């Protein structure tokens, strides 16, 4: 089904079966999840502290329900794009959880303004009850859905009768329903020389006038009083204003839009960056950092939370760099200094702090063994092999937090443009040699803290790592002084928590690569009449290379492949885990 036909298909649907086809799920799955088990029985609730006082309740759906909700989100997003195209509407007002929109773009719309009005909608998602959601799909002129279809969509979207925070489809449904309000408020703002935008429950209206239009808001002794017309439009749209969060700010003071300062450029509040850096410093020194929970009690924070904070700061910096035409992609990821630590010269202070955290997450504070490979195809091989051999290596798996299913308990490092920029690590033995050369300096930068898990480089036993092995022979006292001996070892302990595993030499002593661990009948598989050549990275008229082999043979046919030759790698990983555990306890 093409993208442009989805709205018509949804309008034409008259049954759950029709809806299931549009969502590309089986009817029995849709019915079982929504009705037999019951959508209300498939949520886990937890709270997170709000920026100010109080807590925010998150309702996280199960994987099965989340899958349906994501499909509904994609469907409704496509329908909305089609509606806007038909009606020639440009969505310049709603920025929350929208395709191509962000919290930064929302703030950017109000940068450098004289006066900014911030309005908060009270209990935003709770304002969308089951009847309101169902009624929208039934009566809105853009949809006019069949009652069965409208009811099923509302059933999938709502929890305890309202849209929950935590569902993938809550944002798109709320934005659809808010569309009329957005257009009316934008028109009202424009009438009085103001700019309007909304990010979920945060409404922002700004102006370059020296005084804010009286029709929009005034400052009274008791505080900011919103104009009657403005209040009427919001309340008629089914929302209540949280008066305690209404505020007017002027250019002479700090102006914020959805948590970002906008006086001159869009920026992170300095206190936020200092807090993030301080939390990271505590993590490096003690192995943990503390944040207050919903009751104000200090509890240990996770790596993901801190990474989110650093990532948000970097996202804002990158946005400003692009706007200033500095470090514009792809130039941002091009290194100009080839010395060992030269890549850091391109990083500003914030980026250096983020770089240090990323390194810590993967190689010093890693909560499970980190596996580094030479390239992306090796990652695919190892994952497919380990899943196939799961019963033989239960210690290399863990239960998922939200289900009884198992997942690999190894962090198989994925290199990309981001890791190249922040870590100078994008795969290939040249990068890995520099990684080892820098390891001691990086290790020392975490104030003597000791990693709890090993870092394991899994490499081909061919000419690729020759320079690295020669470096170990000449510069690392703990390693053998004979490269030939190293090539025969089950694993090499370099120093600290760093190890190397090489593919085993052939029975005749010849060098090998990871592809040599596959059975001959798998290596002989032809794709489109072409033979596999492990030394061919491209795709010629007669041969195909590693990428196609990894995707169309290993990934697509993994259930039919005998991966027993990979046991040598996983046995080595098991032994390394035990070796490092003994080191920590000695």
Curated annotation (Swiss-Prot):
Keyword entries, A-Z: Antiviral defense, Endonuclease, Hydrolase, Magnesium, Metal-binding, Multifunctional enzyme, Nuclease, Nucleotidyltransferase, RNA-binding, RNA-directed DNA polymerase, Transferase, Transposable element
User: Into which family does the record put it?
Assistant: Belongs to the bacterial reverse transcriptase family.
Q: Which residues bind Mg(2+)?
A: 120, 201-202
Q: What does this protein do?
A: Reverse transcriptase (RT) component of antiviral defense system retron Ec67, minimally composed of a non-coding RNA (ncRNA) and this RT. Expression of these 2 elements confers protection against bacteriophage T5. At multiplicity of infection (MOI) of 0.02 cultures grow normally when infected with T5 without collapsing, at MOI 2 cultures enter growth stasis. Responsible for synthesis of msDNA-Ec67 (a branched molecule with RNA linked by a 2',5'-phosphodiester bond to ssDNA).
- Location of the Reverse transcriptase domain: 29-262
InterPro entries per record: Bacterial_RT (IPR053543), DNA/RNA_pol_sf (IPR043502), GrpII_Intron_Splice-Mob/Def (IPR051083), Reverse_transcriptase_msDNA (IPR000123), RT_dom (IPR000477)
Q: What's in the misc comment field?
A: Retrons may be the ancestors of retrovirus.
Single GO term (MF): RNA binding
Query: What the record says about its domains?
Result: The N-terminus is the reverse transcriptase, the C-terminus (downstream of residue 430) is also required for msDNA synthesis. The C-terminus was originally suggested to have RNase H activity, but may have another nuclease activity instead.
Q: What is its EC number?
A: 2.7.7.49, 3.1.26.4
Q: What name goes with this protein? A: Retron Ec67 protein
Keyword Disulfide bond applies: no
Gene inactivation effect = No synthesis of msDNA.
Please provide an example of a Pfam family that matches this protein in its UniProt record.
RVT_1
Q: Which reactions is this enzyme annotated as catalysing?
A: DNA(n) + a 2'-deoxyribonucleoside 5'-triphosphate = DNA(n+1) + diphosphate; Endonucleolytic cleavage to 5'-phosphomonoester
User: Which source organism?
Assistant: Escherichia coli
For this protein, the record's SUPFAM superfamilies field holds: DNA/RNA polymerases
The biological processes this protein is annotated with in GO are: defense response to virus
Q: The organism's lineage?
A: Bacteria, Pseudomonadati, Pseudomonadota, Gammaproteobacteria, Enterobacterales
């Amino acid at each position: 089904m093409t993208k442009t036909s989805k709205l018509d298909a949804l309008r034409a649907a008259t049954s759950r079966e029709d809806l299931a086809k549009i969502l590309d799920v089986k009817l029995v799955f849709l019915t079982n999840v929504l009705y037999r088990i019951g959508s209300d029985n498939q949520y886990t609730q937890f709270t997170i502290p709000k920026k100010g006082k109080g807590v925010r309740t998150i309702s996280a759906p199960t994987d099965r329900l989340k899958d349906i909700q994501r499909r509904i989100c994609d469907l409704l997003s496509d329908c909305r794009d089609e509606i806007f195209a038909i009606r020639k509407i440009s969505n310049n007002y709603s920025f929350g959880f929208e395709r191509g929109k962000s919290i930064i773009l929302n703030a950017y719309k109000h940068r450098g303004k004289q006066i900014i009005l911030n309005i908060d909608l009270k209990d935003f998602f709770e304002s969308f009850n089951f009847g309101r959601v169902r009624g929208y799909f039934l009566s809105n002129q853009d949809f006019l859905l069949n009652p069965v279809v409208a009811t099923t969509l509302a059933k999938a979207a709502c929890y305890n009768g309202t849209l929950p925070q935590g569902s993938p489809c809550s944002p798109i449904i709320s934005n659809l329903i808010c569309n009329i309000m957005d257009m009316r408020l934008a028109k009202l703002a424009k009438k009085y020389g103001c700019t309007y935008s909304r990010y979920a429950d945060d409404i922002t209206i700004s102006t370059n006038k020296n005084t804010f239009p009286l029709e929009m808001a005034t400052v009274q002794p008791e505080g900011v009083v919103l104009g009657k017309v403005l209040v009427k439009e919001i309340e008629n749209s089914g929302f209540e204003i949280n008066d305690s969060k209404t505020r007017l700010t002027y250019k002479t003071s700090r102006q914020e839009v959805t948590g970002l300062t906008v006086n001159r450029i869009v920026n992170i509040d300095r206190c936020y960056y200092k807090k993030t850096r301080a939390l990271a410093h505590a993590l490096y020194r003690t192995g943990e950092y503390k944040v207050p929970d919903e009751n104000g009690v200090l509890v240990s924070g996770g790596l993901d939370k801190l990474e989110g904070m650093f990532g948000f700061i970097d996202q804002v910096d990158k946005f400003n760099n692009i706007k200033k035409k500095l470090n514009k992609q792809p130039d941002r990821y091009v290194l100009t200094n080839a010395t060992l630590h030269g890549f850091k010269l391109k990083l500003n202070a914030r980026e250096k702090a983020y770089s240090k955290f990323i390194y810590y997450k993967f190689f010093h504070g890693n909560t499970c063994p980190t596996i580094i490979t030479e390239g992306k195809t090796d990652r695919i091989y190892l994952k497919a092999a380990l899943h196939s051999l799961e019963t033989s290596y239960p210690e290399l798996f863990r239960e998922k937090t939200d289900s009884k299913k198992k997942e690999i308990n190894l962090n198989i490092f994925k290199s990309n443009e981001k890791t190249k920029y922040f870590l100078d690590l994008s795969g290939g033995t040249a990068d890995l040699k520099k990684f080892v050369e820098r390891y001691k300096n990086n290790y020392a930068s975490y104030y003597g803290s000791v990693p709890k898990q090993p870092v394991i480089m899994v490499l081909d036993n061919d000419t690729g790592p020759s320079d690295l092995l020669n470096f170990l022979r000449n510069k690392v006292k703990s390693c053998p002084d004979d490269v030939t001996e190293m090539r025969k070892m089950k694993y090499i302990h370099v120093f600290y928590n760093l190890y190397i595993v090489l593919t085993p030499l052939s029975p005749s002593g010849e060098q090998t690569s990871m592809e040599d661990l596959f059975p001959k009948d798998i290596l002989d598989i032809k794709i489109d009449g072409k033979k596999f050549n492990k030394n061919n990275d491209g795709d010629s008229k007669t041969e195909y290379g590693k990428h196609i082999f990894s995707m169309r043979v290993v990934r697509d046919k993994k259930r039919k492949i005998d991966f027993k030759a990979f046991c040598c790698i996983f046995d080595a990983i098991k032994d390394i885990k035990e070796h490092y555990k003994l080191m920590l306890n000695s």
